[in-house]
From Swiss-Prot:
InterPro entries: CDPK_Ser/Thr_kinases, EF-hand-dom_pair, EF_Hand_1_Ca_BS, EF_hand_dom, Kinase-like_dom_sf, Prot_kinase_dom, Protein_kinase_ATP_BS, Ser/Thr_kinase_AS
Gene encoding the protein: CPK1
Binding residues for Ca(2+) 2: D500, D502, S504, T506, E511
Binding positions (Ca(2+) 4): D570, D572, D574, R576, E581
Domain remarks in the Swiss-Prot or TrEMBL record: There are 3 contiguous domains conserved in the CDPK subfamily: a kinase domain, an autoinhibitory (junction) domain and a calmodulin-like domain. The autoinhibitory domain (414-444) inactivates kinase activity under calcium-free conditions.
Species lineage: Eukaryota, Viridiplantae, Streptophyta, Embryophyta, Tracheophyta
Catalytic residues (UniProt): D274 (proton acceptor)
Binding-site positions, Ca(2+) 1: D464, D466, S468, Q470, E475
Record membrane topology: Lipid-anchor
Biased composition (Basic and acidic residues): 47-56, 70-117
Protein name, as recorded: Calcium-dependent protein kinase 1
Residue span, Protein kinase domain: 150-408
Amino acid sequence: MGNTCVGPSRNGFLQSVSAAMWRPRDGDDSASMSNGDIASEAVSGELRSRLSDEVQNKPPEQVTMPKPGTDVETKDREIRTESKPETLEEISLESKPETKQETKSETKPESKPDPPAKPKKPKHMKRVSSAGLRTESVLQRKTENFKEFYSLGRKLGQGQFGTTFLCVEKTTGKEFACKSIAKRKLLTDEDVEDVRREIQIMHHLAGHPNVISIKGAYEDVVAVHLVMECCAGGELFDRIIQRGHYTERKAAELTRTIVGVVEACHSLGVMHRDLKPENFLFVSKHEDSLLKTIDFGLSMFFKPDDVFTDVVGSPYYVAPEVLRKRYGPEADVWSAGVIVYILLSGVPPFWAETEQGIFEQVLHGDLDFSSDPWPSISESAKDLVRKMLVRDPKKRLTAHQVLCHPWVQVDGVAPDKPLDSAVLSRMKQFSAMNKFKKMALRVIAESLSEEEIAGLKEMFNMIDADKSGQITFEELKAGLKRVGANLKESEILDLMQAADVDNSGTIDYKEFIAATLHLNKIEREDHLFAAFTYFDKDGSGYITPDELQQACEEFGVEDVRIEELMRDVDQDNDGRIDYNEFVAMMQKGSITGGPVKMGLEKSFSIALKL
């Protein structure tokens, strides 16, 4: 699922590392092999073993990348470079289907790199029995009929697993992009899980202004259909080709957007793993159009201190620790650093005639700041690139440190503090709501599908250390510390008490989901109406004090003053709450009711875009 196309696509770096040929090192180099060399040899064996017998050591015929404006179908490609390109457009490509990379993550640290593996025949993949014919085999739930709501238009792009079409919502006439994934191409259980995880992560990141939004997922006998917002402005990659390179001011602006997405993803426990210019689309053709991140097919949920070992990504952008098969979210910052280099110069920082050579350069090559246009680029820009492309991930800048760098700052003003983890920031928001709104969020949370809350479930499991299904004060304290939160015990206790709506002394799974749910979920009319209907027990169209009291009893909410809750929401003072008043309460800013300390409200001024 690593090649999602949402809009027209003519990309030059569109091939996963897993399909690369890694040739053995010459014998006279062996004496000087470093740890990185040994690791690269280990990668060599693994990658070689996954290639088909048809792949040869000789280079394939070249296919020159089409110039902007040429109408070609987007395909997965292997990358070859003949010589250092003057522009991205001079990079030659091989038109060839991608080999699927096995994507199994490991969290156990390894004492030393794997020894070089000998070439061997490719492994046979385990097929899912009748995967392309089994209803509900992918989404694991019954969905509505996609064709009843949307009509398909022209094709926008083609990937290994799916084809993206323009689609129109029949009731509104609004245009969206629909990625249709053929179920017959999902050959393994892992392929199916990749699709599920991609959908889960898109829901988890929903609400960020620079992440493409998912409207819904549908499944029929032959395909899974992902309906997303349509970005008609084309790829960042294409604009780089058209320009050659960006001005420093514009490059810094784009860097803020790209790295801002990385910081937000990491705060939500998501690692993208395939950042490249092709995976950023402009909403429109306008010069100042909003930029959106797409394609979460290789993305993974991660916990602090997790170590991943599967080699995925795209050759020019892959971090050295990924090739060494021991990495974490820092790899995303490396990839973003490569993009910054390209924005400024128009060419990738690490290039070679073969993919093996590209990887060698990634592991050992020097950055070129002497060729044009680098002599005319500021020292501050070069300093940032150097610090983003440090090979030791422990010494590399974090996403927040990049945003604080003088070259990236807006008018010399850095962000005041890193983004809180999603758990902390959302619990702070929840803590300032009155109990009526908390109960309403609980109702909405219980109506969401598993794929919509899968990311929050990962977070709950990370904090619930003893797997009891209940988060204790000590577990919440330890969990927040793991994600970098530095709070006093009194502040943690305030959050605990705010989320513990039924006053049980712990936070159960449903309370946690309600407390950490992104508030964009309450923008949907169907969610709002379902929640209102829950409280309107007699179906009169109004919520009365007695009905609100009954709801409090059902949720185990005690020590609540019904009159005060009603007065906060009842705008026309008729002693009852109609639907419009209920919606106004749900959609306006946090309402400070209940025992939560007002000091927590200062955190809401953080420019949090999750």
